[in-house]
Amino acid sequence: MESLFKPYMPKDLSELQDILCSGALAYGKWGKMLEKSLQEYIGVDYLITTNSYNSAFLVLLTTLGLKMGDEVIASPMACLASNQPFAVMGIKVIWADIDPRTGTLDPESVKSKITSRTRAIFHNHFCGYVGYVDEICAVARENGLYIIDDAIEAFGSKYKGCKIGAWGADATIYSFQTVRLPNTIDGGAIVFKDEELYIKSVLVRDYGIDRSRFRDDMNEISSDCDITVPGYGATLNEISSYIGSQQLNQIDSLLAQQKENAIGWKKKLENENVTDVVITGNTEPNYWVYGVLADNKRDFINSWRKKGFYASGVHLPNSYYSIFGNQGELYGVNEFSSRFVALPSGWWFKI
């Protein structure tokens, strides 16, 4: 059966043994090289990598100064990883509804959820399908809110020809977990629009330490280097950074194959009783999966599994989970989740 997800690993990892035996395994040369390569690929100036998406999320929330009692507006139609960190930090998630055709935030619903405690809008681009970028950003700007793009599944997706991360959001968060492209076995990254937030995030990622001042002229810990912000142990190690760097060299061809598969699926499904997930204007999904809307979801999934393709609904709406509290009906979420099916569209096969 053709799997829905599959970890990619380059054939050429010739320097891996040297790194393993180098004695320099913590974040260093390869970590900085990966960050520079990602900056160039995405088209941004301020980016840090982390050892997981979850770590990136916690670093981001701390850097932005979001705290217990604050509210963030988000979509429940997302990976649990995309909303769980808010609960960890005591930040109240307020669910907005989604457009049942696209699976992404409905700008009017977002607008209606804003209160005096709202600090940010968290814009998930569901399964790589890009949401209403300008409309959601406008709501954030009009109300003095941070706009955070969630690219957990959307690396390489585009809006108006620009890759996600280069659209002007205050921050964009990425996952480099095993089934993402690229993957670093596990890892993540954050892009910042603002240099000051970026500088702060470098400290927050590394226990609040300014590494340029941490050691004195005898290489002892310097008493002159104060720790002024709380932080985490979230740097990405050299092995993972090297693997990510090698994958990034192949990323365009991998994404191109996913797009070719999407074209193949569109033709293959012409006579099926399904509709494609609607692609919002001026956007290009990365086709991490190929998304359709089926009236008989269970039957459609079973049918394609019997044909050798692992179809799946992928995510359960996070509003089902009691940790986020019961906030009432979300009709767009209900309709979309009852119909959405993901079909394999990955780099490892051809339709």
In which residue ranges do the predicted regions lie?
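Active-site region of PLP-dependent enzymes
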Residues: 154-160, 167-288, 321
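Active-site phosphate-binding strand-loop segment of PLP-dependent enzymes
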Residues: 101-184, 189-197
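Proline-centric
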Residues: 93, 249, 342-350
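Short beta-strand segments
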Residues: 51, 122-124, 175, 243, ...
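Conserved PLP-binding active-site segment in aminotransferase class I/II-type PLP enzymes
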Residues: 1-63, 67, 88, 123, ...
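Conserved PLP-anchoring active-site segment centered on the Schiff-base-forming lysine
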Residues: 58-114, 120-122, 304
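Conserved PLP cofactor-binding pocket of PLP-dependent enzymes
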Residues: 207-220, 264, 297-341, 345
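Generic structural signal for small/hydrophobic residues in well-ordered secondary structure
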Residues: 16, 38, 56, 72, ...
